[in-house]
């Protein structure tokens, strides 16, 4: 898709013939189609396929995943249809102004800033009317400066019909992601830097002997056998049809203990025999550095939210102005800084998911580790991190077959 997009954009350059622009592929529509297919069909199918019981055959897992995808698609279509039928359109009134005419004059002193058009008897000028259309949890402002328009005022009724477009569908997809982004991102902005700093603080500070290593490994083996026994007991309960609240609670507890056991095994291997390796020491130093940098980024994001988003009107543009100034300094400095701040938000979402819980609705949250990350975790991060709001209104058409409502502005 990316090479095709670049090739189609370059086909409209000045050194090519004009007809090339008309023969290009509709890349914008193709990107929309790929995005919708991935978020509605491909990613949910992959999540349900890998989340299904591993003891089932591939055919059974495919059927189970397809069944869940069909259910999800049905709910999605019903939600889309109901919302479009209820809030798929919006009507509002506006004032139309037109100017009178007069013979050509040589003295333009009567036309000034206070009277920028020809005023007829019985009409008065007004300015700065703001029309607002509310749709799908978003507000779209339309600013009309009427100081340069003219004087004949009449009330007319305009009906704005919002056509069903792919951007409406994309907006529906991103609502869930936006909610998860706010929830996990807020938690992750605190847990991400602090977890890195505490990992450095709790690092292995000395190399243990072989006798100590054998003793610790024996204790870990006992814990492993206890977890295995508990897991076999849960499997017997599952086969017996016991899947109540207590069963799910015990499963979650076993999963958490398994994660803790894996962390302890990794820490033991770092203390012996890898404790003296240079990479191990540098790895923890890198965690400390990134933790401090992440803490600074979290504080900056918090300040930006306070001074630019919570205060109405915004007290100061802050990060917006910083990125603009850095971009004027030279090169891609502003763009690179902006990318770092955005990427940090994505990492905060992932960290928030890891610390907030082991299960989200019907999906399990698996830890992300080097050479130990399960496929469903990647798919869940794609959905939870892709929280970019989309405009629900792509195009509009006008009609006048609905009754007018009273003019809402003085």
Swiss-Prot record:
GO terms for cellular component: membrane. Signal peptide: none annotated. Keywords: Coiled coil, Membrane, Transmembrane, Transmembrane helix. It comes from the Eukaryota. It is a multi-pass membrane protein. Residues 389-410 are annotated as: Disordered. The chain crosses the membrane at residues 30-50, 67-87, 129-149, 156-176, 179-199, 288-308, 330-350. It is found in: Membrane. Residues 389-400 have a biased composition (Low complexity). Its main location: membrane. InterPro entries: LMBR1-like_membr_prot (IPR006876). Residues 245-274 form a coiled coil. Belongs to the LIMR family. PANTHER family: LIMR FAMILY PROTEIN DDB_G0283707-RELATED. This is LIMR family protein SELMODRAFT_432208.
């Amino acid at each position: 898709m990316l090479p095709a997009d670049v090739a189609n954009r370059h086909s409209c350059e000045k050194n090519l013939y004009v007809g090339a622009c008309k023969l290009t592929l509709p890349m914008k529509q193709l990107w929309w189609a790929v995005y919708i297919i991935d978020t509605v069909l491909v990613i949910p199918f992959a999540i349900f396929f890998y989340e299904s019981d591993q003891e089932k055959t591939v055919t059974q897992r495919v059927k189970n995943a397809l069944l869940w995808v069909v259910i999800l698609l049905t709910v999605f279509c019903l939600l889309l249809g109901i919302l479009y039928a209820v809030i798929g359109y919006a009507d509002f009134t506006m004032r139309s102004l037109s100017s009178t005419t007069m013979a050509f004059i040589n003295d333009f002193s009567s036309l000034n800033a206070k009277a920028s058009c020809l005023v007829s008897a019985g009409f008065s000028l007004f300015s700065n009317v703001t029309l607002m259309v509310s749709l799908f949890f978003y507000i779209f402002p339309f600013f009309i400066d009427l100081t340069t328009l003219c004087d004949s005022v009449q009330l007319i009724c305009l009906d704005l019909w919002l056509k069903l477009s792919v951007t409406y569908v994309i907006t529906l997809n991103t609502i869930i992601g936006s909610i998860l982004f706010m929830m996990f991102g807020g938690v992750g902005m605190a847990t991400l830097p602090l977890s890195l700093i505490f990992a450095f603080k709790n690092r292995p500070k000395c190399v243990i002997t072989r006798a100590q290593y054998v003793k610790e490994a024996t204790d870990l083996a006992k814990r492993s056998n206890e977890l295995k026994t508990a897991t076999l007991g849960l499997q017997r309960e599952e086969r017996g049809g016991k899947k109540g609240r207590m069963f799910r609670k015990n499963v979650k507890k076993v999963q958490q203990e398994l994660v803790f056991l894996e962390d302890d095994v990794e820490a033991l291997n770092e203390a012996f025999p890898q404790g003296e390796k240079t990479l191990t020491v540098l790895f923890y130093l890198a965690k400390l550095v990134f933790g401090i940098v992440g803490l600074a980024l979290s504080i900056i994001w918090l300040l930006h939210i306070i001074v630019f988003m919570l205060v109405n009107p915004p007290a100061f543009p802050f990060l917006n102005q910083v990125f603009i100034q850095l971009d004027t300094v030279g090169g891609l400095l502003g763009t690179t800084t902006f990318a770092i701040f955005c990427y940090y938000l994505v990492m905060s979402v992932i960290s928030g998911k890891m610390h907030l819980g082991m299960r989200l609705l019907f999906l399990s949250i698996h830890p992300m580790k080097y050479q130990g990350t399960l496929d469903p975790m990647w798919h869940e991060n794609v959905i939870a991190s892709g929280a970019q709001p989309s405009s629900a209104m792509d195009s509009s058409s006008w009609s006048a077959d609905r009754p007018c409502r009273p003019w809402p502005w003085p």
